[in-house]
Amino acid sequence: MFNEQYKYLRTNVKFSGDVKSIVVSSSYFGEGKTSVAANLAKSFALGNHKVVIVDMDLRRPSLRNFFDIDTEIGVTNVVVNNMDYKLAISHDESIWDLDIIHAGAIPPNANELISSDEMKNFIHTLEDNYDYVIIDTPPIEAYSDAVALSAICDATLLVYRVGETRKSDLVKSVESIRNVNGNLIGLVRINEK
């Protein structure tokens, strides 16, 4: 996707209703979800919105590949130890209104942590302090985390890669989101590698 396409995606998200927290997921690994999440967050920030992107892929975190992370404190530290989320913030110096929270230490019980009341409180705190909360998750067909977060957050974007994602898997992922009353606001198509 090019920069203009992320502006288009940003505009579509903005006009999808009262949306603050957005889950970005895919059916499988390697479909481009983290890249879409990172670029969508940048696009919102460049559009003068206060944005935080959160790495909720607690088993295989990858936001460090897109941003310079200058703290070891992450989501797991904040949620498990009831810490102030501000201690986990890293800043992208090139984009004024973009904050980053990485996953933190890999927990032994990622799914339980994702589904906890403490996680819900963490997300709601971020919603109260940012215009947009972009959440990068593990793939839906690998773990149930994205589906659980879809039930908590305002909206979900599902990324798929042309030539790789099977239609049946995409349909299955859509159904998983809808089964928890998740608000699927769009499919993001990534062309073949």
PLM region descriptions:
Residues 1-31, 35-38, 45-50, 56, ...:
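Short boundary/hinge segments that flank catalytic cores
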Residues 1-3, 7, 11-18, 26-31, ...:
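P-loop/Walker-type NTP enzyme "switch/lid" segment
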Residues 23, 99, 136:
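Conserved beta-strand segments that form the floor/walls of ligand-binding pockets within enzyme
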Residues 25-26, 46, 107-108, 158-159:
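A short, structure-level motif marking secondary-structure boundaries and short turns
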Residues 37-40, 111:
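Short amphipathic alpha-helix
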Residues 43-47, 151-152:
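Alpha-helix C-terminal capping segments
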Residues 49-51, 132-133:
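A generic structural motif
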Residues 111-193:
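Conserved catalytic-core segment of NTP-binding enzymes
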